[in-house]
Amino acid sequence: MPEEAETFAFQAEIAQLMSLIINTFYSNKEIFLRELISNASDALDKIRYESLTDPSKLDSGKELYIKLIPNKTAGTLTIIDTGIGMTKSDLVNNLGTIAKSGTKAFMEALQAGADISMIGQFGVGFYSAYLIADRVTVTSKNNDDEQYVWESSAGGSFTVKADNSEPLGRGTKIXLYIKEDQTDYLEESKIKEIVNKHSQFIGYPIKLLVEKEREKEVSDDEADDEKKDDEAKKDMDTDEPKIEDVGEDEDADKKDKDGKKKKTIKEKY
């Protein structure tokens, strides 16, 4: 029997902030992606730091990355990281019931004319998701707890329940249900533009799932290895989605900053 979802009220200042974000017109809504990628990077930093003293922390997944998955059919943009993840109490406390010290300060700054893009400096960048989404789910798995899912369509409350869907291993998956008038944020070119503009200095791979076969830069040795794999698989081509590293495909066959030649090879997902 599935566990029932528990409902929690947003702390009053957080509810006010969300209302402000949802009901005010902001021109630079795109900063939501910068904030969510920044949070993902912080979560990756935390698990990497923990693994320095306890390598077994990475037994739940050694690869550290951020993945973006636009789905036009479902109208969702999903941001996945293999970072430290959140426990149930983290989801309840960090995403709604305990106001960060910056919540009130940011609202006051906004009302005094500050730009929405400053939201991350006040520690409440997560809520920028509601600039472009009318519903958000956050599925998370921390090494010290089971997998849980947080959900809210704003409106003053959120739910948290045990999650028995696809196991994450470790990390966090944020699904944004995009507002009908914001669907340009599901376009591959738009996502790449935002990532290259705001998140180019993130220290982890940012992978973008795309609907067609694309090219990805690799080293000569990797290219040779994967070329063999491709030859073995060339009769198996399908229209399945593919992954590419954001910002790599335009620089095919150029030397990288270390002077190494890179080739483009096709990577299947």
UniProtKB/Swiss-Prot annotation:
ATP binds at N39, D81, K100, F126. Keywords: ATP-binding, Chaperone, Cytoplasm, Nucleotide-binding, Stress response. Disulfide bonds: none annotated. Homodimer. Interacts with shu. Molecular chaperone that promotes the maturation, structural maintenance and proper regulation of specific target proteins involved for instance in cell cycle control and signal transduction. Undergoes a functional cycle that is linked to its ATPase activity. This cycle probably induces conformational changes in the client proteins, thereby causing their activation. Interacts dynamically with various co-chaperones that modulate its substrate recognition, ATPase cycle and chaperone function. Required for piRNA biogenesis by facilitating loading of piRNAs into PIWI proteins. Residues 225-245 have a biased composition (Basic and acidic residues). Belongs to the heat shock protein 90 family. GO terms for molecular function: ATP binding; ATP hydrolysis activity; ATP-dependent protein folding chaperone; unfolded protein binding. It holds the Pfam family HATPase_c_3. Residues 260-269 have a biased composition (Basic residues). It is found in: Cytoplasm. PANTHER family: HEAT SHOCK PROTEIN 90 FAMILY MEMBER. One of its GO terms (cellular component) is cytoplasm. PROSITE patterns: HSP90. Residues 213-269 are annotated as: Disordered. It comes from the Eukaryota. This is Heat shock protein 83.
